[in-house]
Amino acid sequence: MLDAALIKECADPSLKPAIVEQFVAAAGSTDPLAVSVESGGRLILVPKATSAGEAMAIVRQYVGQAVVRVGLTQFPVGVGVKNAADLQPDLVDACENLRKGTSMFAKVLRIVAKSYGNPESDDVIPQIFEDAVYAWKTGEFEGVSVFQAPDPGGSVATEEVLRSDDRDSHTQDSASEWPEGNDSVGSAAMRIDLSRIGGT
């Protein structure tokens, strides 16, 4: 769980703190020095960095050859960088990584919301969030490279994104409710003749 002061100081102000927490929980890491490297759809095991210098050495080793993500938000390192020498060590700074990552995620969220027609219904917001997290992880949404795409601007009404466990419990509650009516055997809406089962 992220520190509330870190979120308040560093996260993109267009995202509510609950959205930032859920974004980092779904797509990020609890370790600001975390580096993940993926090539050809496969995760490459890299040594765990114990300092910012080690993390940046790993990043510089793989950038340009593989998809490299770093920090709390698992920010995609190649975005906006032409040369490995241009990489700044602030990528592994918790505050700066959260600032850059949430700013980029807010843009991705707006891109996804625009494809939905910028709805304000509370029923659609969780799906938009899930699609935005998926787009963050893959780098694409509906064939568009979300990191290089222009920001559509505007805002997304993200009042509350339901957590998946909250949604699951809600659907289970509604599924367990039986329609009211007569409990007699003959009052069923649909009947199936099962008399032929068993060979009789």
Curated annotation (Swiss-Prot):
Organism domain of life: Bacteria
InterPro entries documented for this protein: TraH_2
Region (Disordered): 149-200
Compositional bias annotation for Basic and acidic residues: 160-171
Assigned keywords, A-Z: Plasmid
Family: To A.tumefaciens Ti plasmid conjugal transfer region I ORFR2 and ORFR3.
Name used for this protein in its record: Uncharacterized protein y4dP
Organism: Sinorhizobium fredii (strain NBRC 101917 / NGR234)
Organismal lineage: Bacteria, Pseudomonadati, Pseudomonadota, Alphaproteobacteria, Hyphomicrobiales
